[in-house]
Amino acid sequence: HFYGYGELRTGQPVIVDIFPRDGRTRYNGDCTRTVVHGDIPDEVKRMHAAVRAAKAAAESVIKVGATGEAVHRATVQAMLDAGYGWGLPKADSPLSYCAITHGTGHGIGIDVHEPPLLDLKGPPLLAGEALTVEPGLYRRDLGGVRIEDMVIVTQNGFENLNRLGDGLSWK
């Protein structure tokens, strides 16, 4: 995780990633939200809408037997459909280059990051697996937007363990 640097500015997206560990069971949680103090720039609103759509696309694939690869490809396609890129920026990319630069999610349990991964090599999903679904978009001159929930894989889909809203408002 990157902790950032410098002062926070009004209108800047702030990614808040929390991953508490239960003191008794030693199992981890993981949740990310993005918030903005003050007026939200139009491009941040557009990025946020694309991340929400990508998360919904990923979740529509999750069920027993679906692969982590299929989940990730659904995420990437939603980002591409929204006009964003895929992959790290090249050295000569403009500061406005905006893309998904990581996998869609990961298993979670005793470790915060564990298999299965929701990426291009992601295996078939099993009933009862705990996963995160966390698409994000990142832009060097503006910042990033990510939404992350924990889910449990079920026979016909998933159960979302998070109840926190995913809006951008700081208030």
Summary of predicted features, one role per range:
Residues 1-171:
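Active-site neighborhoods and metal-handling regions in enzymes and metal-associated proteins
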